[in-house]
Amino acid sequence: MSEHRQALGRYGEELAVKHIRQAGLTVLECNYRCPLGEMDIIAQEGETIIFIEVRTRSTGSRGWGEESITAKKRERLYRIATHYLKFRNYKEWPSLRFDLIAIRCQNQEGKQPDIIWIRGI
């Protein structure tokens, strides 16, 4: 992955964390890594644990972030979430939700990135 894409991804994740906190959620973990992959953000809203994938794009040439979640990717996110819950020794599984936050950074002077939060992917 190019340095530019890595920087764009980090920027998008930072924006997403700010957005999540402003919405009143508690961020439990960022960039949770396990042998199965990585979960960008794990948050909590009330009794619900939310696993959040962040997709940041500067152009739509390869499709926007919200268009890029495949069934295979969702399945991987579910497996990572299962690992997280087992690793954190949850005795009973809490209510779970999987969300996507798509960030569109279109390099228009003075324009803030668009943040699209899709709950329950």
UniProtKB/Swiss-Prot annotation:
Transmembrane segments: none annotated. SUPFAM superfamilies: Restriction endonuclease-like. Coiled coil: none annotated. Pfam families: UPF0102 (PF02021). Disulfide bonds: none annotated. Gene3D superfamilies: 3.40.1350.10. One of its GO terms (molecular function) is nucleic acid binding. InterPro entries: Restrct_endonuc-II-like (IPR011335), tRNA_endonuc-like_dom_sf (IPR011856), UPF0102_YraN-like (IPR003509). HAMAP family: UPF0102 (MF_00048). Belongs to the UPF0102 family. This is UPF0102 protein Dhaf_3740. The lineage of its organism: Bacteria, Bacillati, Bacillota, Clostridia, Eubacteriales.
